[in-house]
């Protein structure tokens, strides 16, 4: 069997939703035995669509000769990996975009913290180097070497 792409599963899901809508309409307009055969037919179609979806979404180990790749716009189903947290959000009837937004905000806060620490250490490095140059002139060469290696301000560029 050929590898299943995301668009195939998407089409299968749309078909299942369409069958559910048709069943809802048939139940709403149910008139008794004369519409029963139509409702049974629609339920059988839904069963077939669900069976197709189930077949397409079963995990399949990649075969050795299976070198097919999905495109960037339509990846193979087995290549898609979702974080378990997103699955939990959907299971809890929450919008997965909320998880994405919260994750991005958390990463931004972490980046800001790290940037602040980096700037604080750079400032401390420069102050320490300046004080060491003035207190121990014999270590000036070593201080300059360390500053050059760590990207610090040199003595001749400081004001």
From Swiss-Prot:
The keyword Transcription regulation applies. One of its GO terms (cellular component) is mediator complex. Pfam families: Med10. Residues 54-77 are annotated as: Disordered. The keyword Magnesium does not apply. InterPro entries: Mediator_Med10. GO terms for molecular function: transcription coregulator activity. GO terms for biological process: regulation of transcription by RNA polymerase II. Keywords: Activator, Nucleus, Transcription, Transcription regulation. It comes from the Eukaryota. Its main location: nucleus. Belongs to the Mediator complex subunit 10 family. This is Mediator of RNA polymerase II transcription subunit 10. The lineage of its organism: Eukaryota, Fungi, Dikarya, Ascomycota, Pezizomycotina.
């Amino acid at each position: 069997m050929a590898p299943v792409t995301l668009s195939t599963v998407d089409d299968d899901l749309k078909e299942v939703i369409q069958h559910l809508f048709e069943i809802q309409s048939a139940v709403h307009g149910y008139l008794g035995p004369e519409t029963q055969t139509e409702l049974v037919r629609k339920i059988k179609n839904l069963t077939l669509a669900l069976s197709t979806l189930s077949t397409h979404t079963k995990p399949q180990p990649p075969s050795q000769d299976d070198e097919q790749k999905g495109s960037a716009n339509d990846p193979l189903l087995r290549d898609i990996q979702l974080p378990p947290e997103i699955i939990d959000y959907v299971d809890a009837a929450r919008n997965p975009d909320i998880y994405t937004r919260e994750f991005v905000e958390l990463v931004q806060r972490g980046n800001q913290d790290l940037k602040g620490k980096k700037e604080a250490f750079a400032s401390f490095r420069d102050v320490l180097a300046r004080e060491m140059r003035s207190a121990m002139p014999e270590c000036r060469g070593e201080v300059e070497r360390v500053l050059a290696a760590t990207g610090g301000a040199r003595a001749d560029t400081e004001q």
